[in-house]
Amino acid sequence: MADLENTLYMELKDGRVVIELLPDLAPRHVERVKTLARQGFYDGTVFHRVIEGFMAQGGDPTGTGTGGSDLGTLPAEFTRQRGFVRGTVGAARTGDPNSANSQFYIMFAPAPHLDGQYTIWGQVTEGMDHIDAIKRGAGGSGMVSNPDKIVSMKVAADAG
């Protein structure tokens, strides 16, 4: 049985994505994501940057890649215990390793060049086909016009 307190249900237009949270690797990031999910912060936010064969990035309330929550930045929680593979959920940040806030990305494919350089806080366990269906961006930036949205994101323990 899954640990419902450390499981997220992300509803997309095509269906549910289940994400196992990894508090053993990134306790502060997991706590932040759960807090924001419980506030409804992610509901209606978009996947603003989506690069084919790499990742889908979301969690920015402005939809531009420059926004975040009002909870401030988080210190990096890097690990070498686990690498970036298909379905890994990582914390997006600026060039400053201690600048993560609310944005995250989900990997379409392995990306070993990210290992130990970005915080891993989750792993998709169901619904990766729905992640694969997210609208892709154009050009090298991956910025998406008319992007797909997160319908809702909830902690499984709260989803009746």
Which residue stretches match the model-derived regions?
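Cyclophilin-like peptidyl-prolyl cis-trans isomerases
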Residues: 1-160
